[in-house]
Amino acid sequence: MKIKAKNIVKIYDQKLPSELKALDKVTTEINQGEFIAIIGQTGSGKTTFIQHMNALLLPDQGEVEYLYFDSKNQEKKLVVQKPRFFRKKLKFINEIRRRVGVVFQFAEYQLFEQTIEKDIIFGAVSMGTPKNEAKKIAAEIIELVGLDQSFLQKSPFELSGGQKRRVAIAGILAMDPDIIFFDEPTAGLDPQGTLKMLEILDTLYKKGKTIILATHDLDSVLEWTKRCIFFKDGRIIYDGDTYSILANNKFLIENKMLPTNLLNFREKLIKIGYPISNVRSVSELISEINMLIQKETNAD
């Protein structure tokens, strides 16, 4: 599946000044097989954007276009516009939500008051999977998200915050979406929990899922994603290579995007193939990255 957002505008309160838009003419594309980071401070528009991609919200202006292949391998296109233009197509919202999954930051609100197994089975059955097959799927998926079989018989109230997020991911996976958005999946987790969560997302990406990770934590995403969409005040102010953004010192400082752990950040860059020397400050690190990017550009 491919998603195209075209000049999306969202205003929650029409009485507010016109410049106070939750989303302001947002245009971008999400292609099949990408692993993207959506970065921005709290209130920048990340979550509102995600809700539009999943048709939980409909735009006040602009449109969202979905391109996908149906069960007969025929290419389909669905365009979501302002509600009054979209009423005749509301029946297709379920098709969008089947193909575009979302795991929100407060995952407990996506879980039912029943066993984890029943929760996962419900997602599979809702998509037409026979119940006996759905039970097998639940057993496979629970291990995919890093939990053992014993968790299937537990209730959400017995789980930690990180475990609830993993179970929420399992419930979405049971519906087998093409694209999965994760809204602040590492928020509130300790370093070990953060690493495990990112490893799960990377595993899903390698299995062919399109993964979009929304976060305000730059350190969490640099090792895992190559494309970054940066939101500020409801607008996209950067959409491109994750590491190229580091070449602009002024941009990083103005948007409070500096990495918090210089040593850890340097090690991540080396791991993905950037030969960074023993820099002593963020400014030196940015300067060296700038030279490397320029060298690669000249080589191309």
Swiss-Prot record:
Top-rank EC class of the record's enzyme: translocase
A molecular function (GO) term: ATP hydrolysis activity
Coiled coil: none
Record carries keyword Metal-binding: no
EC number: 7.-.-.-
Compartments in which it is found: Cell membrane
Coarse class of the protein's main subcellular location: membrane
Annotated CDD domains: ABC_cobalt_CbiO_domain1
Membrane topology field: Peripheral membrane protein
Keyword Membrane: yes
GO CC term (a single one): ATP-binding cassette (ABC) transporter complex
Keywords for the protein's UniProt record, in alphabetical order: ATP-binding, Cell membrane, Membrane, Nucleotide-binding, Translocase, Transport
Pfam family, one: ABC_tran
Cross-referenced InterPro entries: AAA+_ATPase, ABC_transporter-like_ATP-bd, ABC_transporter-like_CS, ABC_transpr_CbiO/EcfA_su, ECF_ABC_transporter_ATP-bd, P-loop_NTPase
Residues annotated for ATP binding in this entry: G40, Q41, T42, G43, S44, G45, K46, T47
Stretches assigned to the ABC transporter domain: 3-258
Assembly, per entry: Forms a stable energy-coupling factor (ECF) transporter complex composed of 2 membrane-embedded substrate-binding proteins (S component), 2 ATP-binding proteins (A component) and 2 transmembrane proteins (T component).
Function: ATP-binding (A) component of a common energy-coupling factor (ECF) ABC-transporter complex. Unlike classic ABC transporters this ECF transporter provides the energy necessary to transport a number of different substrates.
NCBIfam families, A to Z: PRK13651.1
Name assigned to this protein: Energy-coupling factor transporter ATP-binding protein EcfA2
